[in-house]
Amino acid sequence: MFSFVDNRLLVLLAACVLLVRALDQEDIESGLCHQEGTTYSDKDVWKPEPCVICVCDNGNIMCDDVTCGDYPVDCPNAEIPFGECCPVCPDGDGTSYSEQTGVEGPKGEVGPKGDRGLPGPPGRDGNPGLPGPPGPPGPPGLGGNFAPQMSYGYDEKSAGISVPGPMGPMGPRGPPGPSGSPGPQGFQGPSGEPGEPGAAGALGPRGLPGPPGKNGDDGESGKPGRPGERGPSGPQGARGLPGTAGLPGMKGHRGFNGLDGAKGDNGPAGPKGEPGNPGENGAPGQAGPRGLPGERGRPGAPGPAGARGNDGSPGAAGPPGPTGPTGPPGFPGAVGAKGDAGPQGSRGSEGPQGARGEPGAPGPAGAAGPSGNPGTDGQPGGKGATGSPGIAGAPGFPGARGAPGPQGPAGAPGPKGNNGEPGAQGNKGEPGAKGEPGPAGVQGPPGPSGEEGKRGSRGEPGPAGPPGPAGERGGPGSRGFPGSDGASGPKGAPGERGSVGPAGPKGSTGESGRPGEPGLPGAKGLTGSPGSPGPDGKTGPAGAAGQDGHPGPPGPSGARGQSGVMGFPGPKGAAGEPGKSGERGVAGPPGATGAPGKDGEAGAQGPPGPSGPSGERGEQGPAGSPGFQGLPGSPGPAGEAGKPGEQGAPGDAGGPGPSGPRGERGFPGERGGQGPAGAQGPRGSPGSPGNDGAKGEAGAAGAPGGRGPPGLQGMPGERGSAGMPGAKGDRGDAGTKGADGAPGKDGARGLTGPIGPPGPSGAPGDKGEGGPSGPAGPTGARGSPGERGEPGAPGPAGICGPPGADGQPGAKGESGDAGPKGDAGAPGPAGPTGAPGPAGNVGAPGPKGTRGAAGPPGATGFPGAAGRLGPPGPSGNAGPPGPPGPGGKEGAKGSRGETGPAGRSGEPGPAGPPGPSGEKGSPGSDGPAGAPGIPGPQGIAGQRGVVGLPGQRGERGFSGLPGPAGEPGKQGPSGPNGERGPPGPSGPPGLGGPPGEPGREGSPGSEGAPGRDGSPGPKGDRGENGPSGPPGAPGAPGAPGPVGPAGKNGDRGETGPAGPAGPAGPSGVRGAPGPAGARGDKGEAGEQGERGMKGHRGFNGMQGPPGPPGSSGEQGAPGPSGPAGPRGPPGSSGSTGKDGVNGLPGPIGPPGPRGRNGDVGPAGPPGPPGPPGPPGPPSGGFDFSFMPQPPEPKSHGDGRYFRADDANVVRDRDLEVDTTLKSLSAQIENIRSPEGTRKNPARTCRDLKMCHSDWKSGDYWIDPNQGCNLDAIKVHCNMETGETCVYPSQASISQKNWYTSKNPREKKHVWFGETMSDGFQFEYGGEGSDPADVNIQLTFLRLMATEASQNITYHCKNSVAYMDQETGNLKKAVLLQGSNEIEIRAEGNSRFTYGVTEDGCTQHTGEWGKTVIEYKTTKTSRLPIIDIAPMDVGTPDQEFGIDIGPVCFL
């Protein structure tokens, strides 16, 4: 009989060995039970409710209620655990049943043998298995050159798909290039197709024991046991307590006579009476001595059962009874009280190894039961003796990261790679050390002819000979002495470009270029054909354990087992004392080979191997694009003089050099013989005058000569006296505009303005040279965790978990009877691995297995041969503009522009949004070119661009090289089915079943031993750089797989550390000469060569520049006065002279205008009495001004002297002043309240509306720039709103066909004023206005307005203006061009879009229609509109016209 622990171990072993295989439904055996959608196997026990327990018996369900009355609970706080029926005491306080002792009842029959108990706790971890065989080949590697695949179909103008030509023969291998810096990380590639499954590896040896697990929760009750055999009779019990009084016994024997009584009085003798009644019993006498034992009486009838006596001491074990027949399974009994633990039995002998059973069919999936509450931990027991190694436990959580291991040894040198792509042109290297002097250069061309020597001193005058005849040309004279070198002439014009010189020697390798930006991800290529399996690689390190798989469905019920062992286990007893260690068992047979381990992760990169042998010569690469001009090198040493060169072609004549120094006086030549007379030469220039000859005799008087030519102009005569002033001339015509004045001096430097808004993105500059790599930045802060990755593939089924810790030792049980010999025991734990046995014979090949699941991807294959250069791919999408780089050095200051009108100084506002482009100023004169600025520091890297669109699907790649065939596996023939033996050792894990439903989350287990490495999951988003981990063990290289498609480019990786330099390889074959390098910097002048021989006479030089001015000649004699010149222009006004002395009084002027009537004067003196007459007027002052004045007697010539009492004159003066004041007052009033007339224009219509709110809308004159009113313009004022509306110069454009396209199907926007013949840009200002004046006034209007609007009406015939009714979109809508040259569209950014109030140009009807376009904006610089560009024009039947509305500012 097994103990309960053994029983649990058996169940645990069976659970670990179970292979989950998917079988068809028809394989499921009958005998199952179904209840509420759940299927139970035969003999399954379950509790549908806590107080109901059911059992499945060959398809029948039998249920019974659980009663709790037999075990009353005696504690104050009893509780019913979750899922249980009966109350229990929480921590053992109180008693769970009363301790009244009853009479011992009769012994019950032995119960039936119980079913197998629940699985026990998992054993400890086993030792780590041996490494598995190498995995199958990895996934295909990255693709090669995708350019040919991506180029098809992109060029819209190509005549068809360009088909690549046949591949040329592979050129000889070039020498290895320098290692480039690591390229950017590629984007994650799509998952490869699953590979074929790898061969199963050998089973590893048993692992080391894991640490003891936590005590498991109590298992559910086991199935009810079958009735046991009848036990032997128990020993006699102890004496019971006295029984209750029995019933009265039967009548006893007659007693002895009593003693005589005292003598009574003598009575009279009576007659003999009847016998009297018996007397009462006398008092009992004293007990007599004990008599002899009597004979044994007959057994009486059994009395009623007495109360239960105390338990007797155990008797000796009786002999075993015969085995009873197996009874039917009883209902589960109530849980019995826990018995004491019996002593450990001796170890049974080792049973034979059973044959491996066939895997059972999987049973239907059971419903997941509710998760029980975790029990409280028990008290820790005493330390037990070391147990035998348990079954390998489940992998624990990964341990803490170990310290980094030591650097692994350098790997063997890898095979030589193909030539790398040529790197980008490196930066110019540092100037080399001074070279050895080069060989002598070729002889230079002959120098310019020397200057003539000094003129010799004058010879003695010879006698004058008679003129001879002209002589023949003399032979060449003997060579003269060379003249001294003249100064070099000015530099000649540059010659034509010489032919390309021979290629220079190959330069040293430049530094690696910066890695390019990540390319667009290539399309997924077709899957290559799988390579044949490679040889087994070395075992990789164990991967991390995968997560526990979901529980598989229960298997089908097995064949009916033998009778079960003990019945239900009782509740958990208190922990017993630790038992003694058992003897060491016999070593078991070696276990079967374990499944292969998972491939390890790739090891850390080894150091670079030694340099490979030199490759063959590579084909000449295409010429690289010329690099940027390098900085000038340091000057080299002077070369040696060159060898004399061949005679060069005569150069262009140089300009005459400056005069050389005067030569030394030459030796006088020998006198030559007289030559024959030459032909008459041209008249020589007059010789210098000879010395005076002897005075001749006086000749005869000559005839008078003719009139000589006028002499040279004489010196100016002395200044004449001022003439009389001339009459006043007519007003001259307006002069032409003077030339621009010289630029004024630079003004004082202004205050630094606020930082302007960022300008618009410039056009992309040429790619700058790669800067040097910056120093590695500090490790960044840990990034936030990445997004949750895709769930990983289900891990392999975990191995069984470790067994729980030993429970407390139970109380000692009663000794049982010695049982019969038990069945063969479960196989013992595996002993230590034995020495390997001799190799068995190769078995016959087994039947072909089913196709395995796809294996993990193979390793990257060898790179294929480099393909031919494909046609260029299409341009990628433009990246987002980078941030503006820092400004260059300040250029030289331009010339000063024209002075603008002074603005009012405002408070400095905050920096506004970027202003509109200003009107194009007249260009300033070009300033001198500034020195090139030093390059600015590299700008901050822009944000990462969005991931590009995937490229086109690439062509199918070439198949990878087939790997060498693997060795055939050894597989024996399948043996005959043996009888069902005891469970064998743990088999290899089966194929993964389908994932079950996820279970409820369990309580966390204790920390396990570090698990094996898991297979790598799919790549997550790039995290921040973590701390560097320890290097993994290097994996064996896998067989090369086919080349896979290129992954997406990942984020650019950080620059890796430089590997150790390998030893230098042998020199490669000399390459073909490369393309000519960029022209080098000009070398320094060489040392002066030796003086060359005199060259041939050069050609006549070109006319030299005028020489420097000679020294002033002597003052000539004054010439005669010339005729008077024409009258000069009037001179500028002189400065004001000093005040002159007061002049004489002028003549009396003419009389002034008549004064106004004076006020009434004071009363005159009384007149003399008049003659009597009619009554006169009332007395009062008369105005004598109307009376004729007698002539004054004091007239004095023309002058007239006023007297203070001459009232008329005073009045005239007052009237004049008054008129002037009134005029000034009116002018001031006009300034304050302008009238909008041409003479008195307002500034804007808004001003007019504010001053004259009752005026009506109409045309008025305005002068926004104020100042002189000659440039005022006529506008329309809307007096309701205050808008100022400026009319166009030409308000309508005639309706006709304005444009016919050469290619009508190619629709594009065509600007009316810029492209169409006879078109023009729109101007504004109404009739008679100067467009230049209007533009200035519009500039001021825009400054004073906050809003502008304008309408344009587009008349159409068969031309779409806005909405295209056929397509329902705005693709054919017209474009408008604003004053600041910005384009205003129908759709897009709402700030640059116009609307329409009427749209009658939506389709081609052959009739005229119109669309009214309206644009309103707060960016006043965009209006007025100056051009329009329709798209739907170009055919002869498409016509349009335009009405241009006024532009209105508010």
Swiss-Prot record:
Superkingdom to which the source organism belongs: Eukaryota
Allysine sites (modified residues): K157, K1194
The VWFC domain, residue ranges: 31-90
Molecular function via GO: extracellular matrix structural constituent; metal ion binding
Post-translational modification: Contains mostly 4-hydroxyproline. Proline residues at the third position of the tripeptide repeating unit (G-X-Y) are hydroxylated in some or all of the chains. Contains 3-hydroxyproline at a few sites. This modification occurs on the first proline residue in the sequence motif Gly-Pro-Hyp, where Hyp is 4-hydroxyproline.
Disulfide bonds: C1245-C1277, C1285-C1448, C1356-C1401
PROSITE patterns the record matches: NC1_FIB (PS51461), VWFC_1 (PS01208), VWFC_2 (PS50184)
Residues modified by glycosylation: K251, K1094, N1351
Biased composition (Low complexity): 182-206, 266-292, 352-374, 388-443, 568-578, 586-596, 637-650, 679-701, 796-806, 817-869, 917-943, 1064-1078, 1130-1145
Entry-annotated residues carrying Pyrrolidone carboxylic acid: Q149
Region of interest (Disordered), residue spans: 97-1201
Segments of skewed composition (Gly residues): 378-387, 471-480, 669-678, 702-711
Localization per Swiss-Prot or TrEMBL: Secreted, Extracellular space, Extracellular matrix
Residue numbers of 5-hydroxylysine PTMs: K251, K416, K491, K737, K848, K1019, K1082, K1094
Modified residues (3-hydroxyproline): P871, P1150, P1165, P1168, P1171
GO annotation, cellular component aspect: collagen trimer; extracellular matrix; extracellular space
Positions contributing to Ca(2+) binding: D1263, N1265, Q1266, C1268, D1271
Residue ranges of the propeptide: 23-148, 1205-1450
Signal peptide: 1-22
PANTHER family in alphabetical order: COLLAGEN ALPHA (PTHR24023), COLLAGEN TRIPLE HELIX REPEAT (PTHR24023:SF1082)
Family to which this protein belongs: Belongs to the fibrillar collagen family.
Function comment: Type I collagen is a member of group I collagen (fibrillar forming collagen).
Oligomer and partners: Trimers of one alpha 2(I) and two alpha 1(I) chains.
UniProt protein name: Collagen alpha-1(I) chain
Gene (UniProt): COL1A1
